[in-house]
């Protein structure tokens, strides 16, 4: 969003308001990030405690369906556009997240000082710190399930929307003010679903109100004011221009008019200013200007095009990032794969922002700087070796918010080509269905994928290297199953001969403990955390919110069980969260979230490898492939609500005179449902789900080899299991 734009437009009395009726028989292009951000940050739809829980908003799906239905009821067809491979603006997002950590600390200080109402208010101001990109895939899945069209742009959603505005593909555009910098005549700036009306503005009236003389001068004004991919010109930020105090967009226009120069000349004029040098502002302005002028979009025929390509500089890749294969953009455009790994490859950079808890813990910093490296290099190698040799020889710089000046290098060239390791997975539908029927397992379940390989004959026969005489995989069940087998082999659960490894056998033990498909993904995620030595009862975080009642043993066991519960979600009504909070468990969930996201990248790149290497029938529709992708594990982020519920229950039991008695257990469960978590759909049922997940994870721990879980740690788990069995 252009800094100061809304304030300026309101003061200048710009814009118009019309009823949704005017959108009848129209296709409305909607900038997805702006649409989601409005839900997250404005009343009555925002959930103030989302930054204190992590994960996904409880009411988001219902709100999206309601708002989409409202548009459709008025005869309007919504068409959502998501940003894709975005390299510009990452530094701005990083700095914004770093600044937000101070407000995060303030909110938690208020909560710790027993001022919950003030804390909730402060948390409510932090809704903008939620990384909307982490919610993209969830929202896309909602849209897909409800038959709402969407497209992921090659790069900027704003540029993509401008390129289709007023065409047969899109009659009108709604989104952030950034879109006005691109070639567009009119923009809907607000959709008011309560009043069923919208506000809109024209680019021409903005230009006239600012008194600038050309569209290029208007674009410079917007850039220098500050936007999503360029910070505000320091002289405007520090109010050193001599202009009357007011919206930055007005000040930027006045500065350009007073000097009768363009944006580049103005930046050259201030280039030696220490603030300009510190921000490398001239270089960043020039890149941002070219980013707008030579934007990249996808045409209806799937062709990727650059605007004004004839005058584009030869080093445009320094602005947009390395050019990626059009096949990758095609899969991205329909949600078959996400943008994370593509962004890494295009920009040669991974940027780690601070998590919602603030990121003060050494354990989290070690995880993102070192612990996630194997997952990242696995995803990068799957893409690089399947796409083009060029990408294999470009090191990726990992920059973390706590030490941005000392990036670490990830070298894909140091890895081996993973394709030869996993190319033997081309199992046919008849084999898959026959085995699923025999096991009485759903083909879509992880328990089937792992359990099928307990049969040594099936495992042996599953070695099916693709050859010229074999037809490629052509059914969703085939593609999904083989993508998952490849993923699990890459993660070490399956050996080269397709037999289960020691890790795979432990995982199978976990799945056999309870026949609950909804707990399979949490169990696998817990096992991955165990492998990283992050599923334990160690005090890893310098925060409040850990168990406080009972003996040291009670506290240790409560903490371990609560951390396991964080892998499964609390089923909550479609309303903002009400209940106790824990910064300690939020910090733990931040680590779980980081691992989950990187596991998802490996899963998606396993699917990409199948597609890019012609193991899948090329005639399969992109929508069909997308449906497969959205069914794969680790799609949605996790929150700490169920972990808090388990901690609250067990902590309260430890304060009872007879913590293991049925009377105490029932009384605390009723109290939890009625007083602590009044909007939980089934507090007691979710506690039992958490305990069932504990049973599964504990079964895997007990069966784990000593090099994964030491005898000392197994004893801690065993003691906790006995302790918990009396408190369920």
What are the roles of these predicted feature ranges?
Residues 1-25:
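N- or domain-start disorder-to-order transition segments that initiate the globular core
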Residues 3-4, 25-152:
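Noncatalytic, basic helical substrate-engagement surface that gates or grips nucleic-acid strands
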Residues 19, 31, 87-88, 132-133, ...:
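Alpha-helix initiation/capping motif
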Residues 20-24, 72-73, 165-168:
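Flexible, charged surface loops at secondary-structure boundaries
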Residues 32, 177, 588:
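Residues that line or immediately flank small-molecule/substrate-binding pockets and catalytic motifs
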Residues 72-82, 96, 102-104, 113-114, ...:
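Non-catalytic, largely sequence-independent nucleic-acid-binding elements associated
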Residues 92-306:
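Extended two-metal-dependent nuclease catalytic cores across DNA- and RNA-processing enzymes
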């Amino acid at each position: 969003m252009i800094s100061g734009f809304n304030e300026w437009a309101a003061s200048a009395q710009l814009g118009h308001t019309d009823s949704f009726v005017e959108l009848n028989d129209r296709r409305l292009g909607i900038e997805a990030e702006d649409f989601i951000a409005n839900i997250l940050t404005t009343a009555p739809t925002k959930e103030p405690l989302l930054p204190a829980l992590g994960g996904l908003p409880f009411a988001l799906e219902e709100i999206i369906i309601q708002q989409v239905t409202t548009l459709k009821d008025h005869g309007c067809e919504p068409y959502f556009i998501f940003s894709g491979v975005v390299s510009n603006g990452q530094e701005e997002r990083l700095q914004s997240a770093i600044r937000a950590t101070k407000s995060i600390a303030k909110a938690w200080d208020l909560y710790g000082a027993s001022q919950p109402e003030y804390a909730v208010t402060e948390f409510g101001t932090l809704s903008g710190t939620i990384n909307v990109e982490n919610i993209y895939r969830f929202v896309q899945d909602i849209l897909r399930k409800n038959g709402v069209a969407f497209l992921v742009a090659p790069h900027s959603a704003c540029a993509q929307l401008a390129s289709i505005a007023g065409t047969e593909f899109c009659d009108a555009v709604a989104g952030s003010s950034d879109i006005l910098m691109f070639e567009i005549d009119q923009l809907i700036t607000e959709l008011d679903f309560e009043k069923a009306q919208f506000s809109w503005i024209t680019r021409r009236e903005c230009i006239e109100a600012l008194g600038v003389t050309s569209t290029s001068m208007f674009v410079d004004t917007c850039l220098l004011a500050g936007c999503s991919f360029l910070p505000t010109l320091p002289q405007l930020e520090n109010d050193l221009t001599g202009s009357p105090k007011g919206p930055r967009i007005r000040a930027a226009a006045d500065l350009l008019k007073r000097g009768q120069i363009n944006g580049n000349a103005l930046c050259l004029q201030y280039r030696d200013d220490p603030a300009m040098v510190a921000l490398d502002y001239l270089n960043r302005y020039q890149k941002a200007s070219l980013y707008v002028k030579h934007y990249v979009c996808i045409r209806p025929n799937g062709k990727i095009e650059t605007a004004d390509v004839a005058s584009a500089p030869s080093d445009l890749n320094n602005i947009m990032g390395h050019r990626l294969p059009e096949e990758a953009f095609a899969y991205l455009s329909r949600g078959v794969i996400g943008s994370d790994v593509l962004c890494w490859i295009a920009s040669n950079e991974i940027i780690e922002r601070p998590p919602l808890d603030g990121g003060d813990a050494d354990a989290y910093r070690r995880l993102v700087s070192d612990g996630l490296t194997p997952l990242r290099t696995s995803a990068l190698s799957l893409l690089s070796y399947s796409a083009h040799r060029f990408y294999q020889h470009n090191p990726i710089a990992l920059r973390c918010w706590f030490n941005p000046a000392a990036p670490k290098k990830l070298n894909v060239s140091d890895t081996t080509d993973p394709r030869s390791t996993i190319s033997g997975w081309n199992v046919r539908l008849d084999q898959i269905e026959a085995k699923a029927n025999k096991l009485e397992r759903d083909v879509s379940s992880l328990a089937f994928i792992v359990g099928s390989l307990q049969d040594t004959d099936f495992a042996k026969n599953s070695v099916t290297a693709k050859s010229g005489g074999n037809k490629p995989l052509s059914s969703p069940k085939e593609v999904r199953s083989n993508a998952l087998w490849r993923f699990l082999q890459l993660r070490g659960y399956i050996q080269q001969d397709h037999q289960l490894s020691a890790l795979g056998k432990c995982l199978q033990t976990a799945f056999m403990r309870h026949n609950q498909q909804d707990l399979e993904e949490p169990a696998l995620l817990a096992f991955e955390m165990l492998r990283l030595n992050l599923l334990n009862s160690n005090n890893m975080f310098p925060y409040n919110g850990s168990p406080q009642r009972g003996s040291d043993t009670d506290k240790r066991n409560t903490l371990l069980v609560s951390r396991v519960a964080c892998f499964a979600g609390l089923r909550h009504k479609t309303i903002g969260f009400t209940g106790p909070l824990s910064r300690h468990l939020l910090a733990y969930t931040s680590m779980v979230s980081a691992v989950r996201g990187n596991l998802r990248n490996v899963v998606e790149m396993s699917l990409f490898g199948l597609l890019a290497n012609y193991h899948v029938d090329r005639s399969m529709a992109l929508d069909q492939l997308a449906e497969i992708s959205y069914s794969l594990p680790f799609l949605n982020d996790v929150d700490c609500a169920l972990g808090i519920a388990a901690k609250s229950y067990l902590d309260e039991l430890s304060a009872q005179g007879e913590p293991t008695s049925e009377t105490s257990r029932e009384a605390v469960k009723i109290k939890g449902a009625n007083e602590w978590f009044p909007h939980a759909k089934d507090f007691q049922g979710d506690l039992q789900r958490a305990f069932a997940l504990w049973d599964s994870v504990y079964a895997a721990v007990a069966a784990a080899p000593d090099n994964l879980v030491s005898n000392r740690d197994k004893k801690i788990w065993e003691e906790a299991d006995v302790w918990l069995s009396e408190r369920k």
